[in-house]
Amino acid sequence: MLISHSDLNQQLKSAGIGFNATELHGFLSGLLCGGLKDQSWLPLLYQFSNDNHAYPTGLVQPVTELYEKISQTLSDVEGFTFELGLTEDENVFAQADSLSDWANQFLLGLGLAQPKLAKEKGEIGEAVDDLQDICQLGYDEDDNEEELAEALEEIIEYVRTIAMLFYSHFNEEEIESKPVLH
């Protein structure tokens, strides 16, 4: 069974890792959406979240399971089952912060997997620009929470769609080689 968001957060914090569960999910999603297919994801994760040090043994398995789950949901292009690993906190302001954290780390992972990402044009280039804007997502504590929650829901759906767009674009050969089952 996949570790819960809060349990993963606790384990990361206890181990002194520089990512929370949301940031970890965003980073791993970015690597996968960028087309990374080999085992280099683990050294990259260590490099960017733990000063090049391996994670404690007890943390490697749940992180690997999360990576595999993200990979599985991303590859289900037809089912669109991919979800952003955002905070379980119901507070709309915490959700907005979580989305911003996720998007920041997603872009980092995506950029590592696709070093020429900044040169992308068209739909992909626009999606990168949109994600950069989402990273800067701001709100005022006086904002209407209901309106913010509605806007946030739309942005989250848009980010899910963008992630699938990147995955489809940078993993084209893999998607095309999968047999269509009827």
Swiss-Prot record:
This one is known as UPF0149 protein CGSHiGG_07585
What's a single GO CC term here? cytosol
What is the phylogenetic placement of the source species in the record?
Bacteria, Pseudomonadati, Pseudomonadota, Gammaproteobacteria, Pasteurellales
As for family, the record states: Belongs to the UPF0149 family.
What Gene3D superfamilies would the database entry show? YgfB uncharacterised protein family UPF0149, PF03695
From which domain of life does this come? Bacteria
